[in-house]
Amino acid sequence: MFLKFFFAFLTMLASTQLFAQYDVPLYTSYTTEAARAKMNERLIKNSITKNLLLPLSDSTEENWEDAFDAMEVMNYHAPFVQSKVEAAFDSIGVRSVSFQRALMELAYANYPGKFIMQTNVLLEETTDPKIFAVCAEYLLQHKKTDAEKQILSKKLLEKFTDTAYKNPVLFMLSTRLKSADVNQQPVHEVLKDIVSKNFLPGQIVMYSFQRKNRDYPGMVLIRNADGNFVRDSSGNLFHLPQLARSISNLPGYLRNGNTPQGIFKMFGFGVSMSNFIGPTANVQMGMPVELSIQKFFDDSTILDSAWTIGWYQKLIPKKLQSYLPLYDSYYAGLAGRSEIIAHGTTIEPDYYAGKPYFPLTPTQGCLCTKEIWNGKRLESDQQKLVNGLLEAGGANGYCVVIEIDDKQAPVAIKDLLPYLKN
């Protein structure tokens, strides 16, 4: 698949000594202006137009899915492709689950509110939990009222009965359909505890503070194993903008959705061979269930191999264990999400000109920092992040992603200072 190919990464773990020497000029032939122009031409001509000219059938579904992927990445709109998307929706009920998922993801990303009638029909007909969830999210994207949530909650329980609470995807959907007061604890109280030295004591922690609206960049800070936040040479808190938005902007429990909130294991640096991620070192991360219990806790003496929520709760202070957003990464892992890392970018930022996060670029759900390339690497917040982690002692520890509020603006260091007095 298109996105799998371009965002796939090669996990090459390396020593701290290697990456201490890694801050050197880099060159990538595929980020020159000429190479990007050729790439755009190939994507439109081959990945999109050529694939969508094929008659839609069981044997060509994958070609159409590749086109949908390319349209998402490029934020591509044209009358020709819209007519093909409309044609695809005409037969969505008889298409494979994979095709339905890809088409609904494209609709969520590129055509919000345009296929409400067709989505309602698919919602009624499908028996697949993930398709039901993405249909529900598409409808909520258009009309996020209490009345709409009640209608969808009723349909969820009628269709899936008791299994709605046992399936991780349906469970997470059900929490999103509840009233806004589902989280009893005010987030400002949660933040104070999460940044304290008593949270994940003795561990290096990379914090990614985000807005609820992931169109706005968040901010990454690093705490060393002694519980102190990393500072720069001037004595100021080390901080960088970091985007936790996926291309689709779907919620984090769904495939290719935004970075889930919660706790991730960090287990070293890696280098990607992807033409969209680039060669700057990335931070390898994993979620509960995706990683074994032994690896997530970095403890080979653990004999249990069956993940339960009780294991995950061992990392969460008792007073925070009722704060549901901290469990997003657990349920995302349980639902099958994987390969969420913290990386730089070599994707063409102009695809997203005019977006609140420009010139940062969205991903398939990873944490992403700004990099500017034109053959040479001109700017790299990702390299600064790597250096900050090295200053803290390396990339072995945990990453915590948490939303702080719904302010319609990028996260600024002044938003975080009240919680960081340690």
Annotate each PLM feature.
Residues 22-76, 80-86, 90-101, 105-109, ...:
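Cell wall/extracellular polymer interaction/catalysis modules
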Residues 132-133:
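Amphipathic alpha-helical protein-interaction segments enriched in hydrophobic
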Residues 1-22:
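Bacterial Sec-dependent N-terminal signal peptides
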